Amino acid sequence: MVLSGDFPLGTDIKSIFQIEDTVFEVDNKSLTNRPDLWGHYGIAREFSALTGRPLRSVETADCAAYAELPPVEIDARDTELLYRYTSVKLRNIKQKVSPVNMRIRLFYCGVRAINLLTDLTNYIMLELGQPMHAFDLRRISSVSVRRFEEPFEFQTLDGVKRSIDPATLMICTGDTPVAIAGVMGGLDSEIEDDTDACLVESANFDGVSVRKTSSRLGLRTDASMRYEKILDPELTMLAAGRFIKLATDIDSGVEVVSSVTDCYVRRYAPVVIDFDKPFVDRYTGIDLSAAQIEKTLLSLGFTVETDSSRFTVGVPSWRATKDVTIRADIIEEITRIYGYDNFAVSTTKSALSPVRPTAAASDENDAKNLLVERFGLHEIHSYLWCDAKRWKEIGLPIEDNVRIVNSINPEQVCLRNSMIPTLLACVSDNKLYAPEFGIFEIAKVIDGRKPDGTCNERKRLGIALFSRIAEEKTLYFRLRDMLACLGRTLRHEAFTFEHTGAEHAWQHPKNTVSVSFRGTALGSMSALHPLNRNLIDKKAAVVFAEIDMDALSLLDGSEIAYAAPSKFPGIDIDLTFTAAMDVPYAELEAAWKALECEFLAGVRLVGIYESGDSNAVTVRFTFVSEEKTLTRAEVTPYIDAIVAALDEKGIRVRTQ
């Protein structure tokens, strides 16, 4: 190693190069929302305000000195996503390697040194927080900022060919793209070993656009992370001047061959905030002097005009993009510089009033408690987006689902429109861990779009039961009892079940019923279609239900009428009906509901047994009187009426 200067033997190399460094560990939770703190100079500004020490200004070249030189040709075609574009051309760059001290600093910041021009852009980005880019001047003579109407492929600096869509803002020379605005440059215009002239870009782009582009391409860079925070547009000229200053200091032969051309397309409106001292006293809880308030704000770069106890504060450009916009933000600045540890500890005094849960919230909590505590179901939590691959594995369609435009995972490209496929996927994942289990979830689905184009969000309850022990019919009626109990719990009246055909491909063509309450459709209950069941476990039974909780929350329940239990014993009579396999239980139920009996206290399904091509359905009728002990003869007329009504429909009563 050849050193410039005369150093005595034994001189510690640490005193020659900036190898030793001081590291400040800053526990700053607000860094994400402070674009000015994404550069060392912004942190230095904070230290200056906290310690009261003066802040040194950044050494830059006088950009006005080059005003007579030819400008860089900048065509700002897209004035929506471009805020400001500053550019300058440099030639006669002989030195290719950055100074040792610069390379050491870059290393300490986790950045690999490449060459002088690239290192300068990275150094200034770390120093000021302003991303920059240097193009080889042999491949770019003018600048055009635009979007393309048709998609195309573009190879970035990392050598990857990326698909560019019409929403992506590009930097071009003429009509040839050379960089993805705010994200990464192109391979064809990168700085090479023999590059001796460059065009420097210092720009400000729309932060939301950069974030979407970065997410869409799966390409997150140091530059894109800073642009996402909505940078100060005033930084572009400062960074350009800093680049010229460092380049000419390091390589004295560097020539600036253009003016520092500044295309300021969109300006932020100045932010001015008015407040008075009583406002500060009320929100801080301490009595700060007007002079102390003014000194604090001035140290942070704010401009302050005072009139007695009133303040008119101008927010500096590096805080005005999204950070400081209202009076409460000023209070935060004053209190954090004053020091939160300097506030006296006091008990908070505030009026507390009970919060009454909404009907929807009460329904959700009551439903969860019932399903977990009484029926032993497991609550799951799943994502709103669905895994297309998993849905296809269990034979579920996704053609009608709302699509995600910029999905990060290529398999998760749509949003679910039903809870059932999510539950079935969970059943498939857990089928090997238990021979029998039940799961449920209350969550949102996207049921198409509203007339205005927005997504139609609905909150639904999904339940799924799985068993390799119980038969499908047993599991089916177990779920039916759960839903009936749910209706009585939430609205003091059981839901109504009516046999219907399958509406979805995964529903059983015969074992599917609609669920309603007083004529309002709430959802459906079904066994899993045999074809879909084979994809999960052909030896197991799977049943499921889906209830629209939003629709239920709009319905009022029955009034709870208290009735003292009778002091006289009741009579239980079991009847077994023989019906064809395709006769639903609701048809039997309609027979006794149509008859009036003052003694009938309850009806319960005891069991269903298959016998050849028919079902044997056992039902228990309970009769109770408030005035006396009933005899069999007193309830026989009602039993005979039920038998006669069902006999007309071809449903017989078994006598043995």
Residue ranges and their predicted role:
Residues 210, 405, 435, 439-473, ...:
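Polyanion/phosphate-binding surface patch
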Residues 226-240, 460-487:
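A conserved active-site cap/scaffold subdomain adjacent to cofactor or substrate pockets
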Residues 42, 273-277, 281-440, 622-624, ...:
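Extended, well-folded interaction surfaces typified by the phenylalanyl-tRNA synthetase beta subunit core
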Residues 8-12, 72-75, 154-158, 180-188, ...:
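Glycine-rich, charged/polar anion/phosphate-binding loops
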Residues 1-340, 344-360:
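RNA/tRNA-interacting regions in translation and RNA-turnover enzymes
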Residues 32-34, 187-188, 207-208, 320-321, ...:
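Short beta-strands and strand-coil junctions in structured, solvent-facing domains, enriched
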Residues 299-302, 306, 312, 454-456, ...:
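A carboxyl-terminal module marker
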Residues 52-64, 113-118, 247-261, 305-308, ...:
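Flexible, glycine/charged-enriched surface loops at secondary-structure junctions
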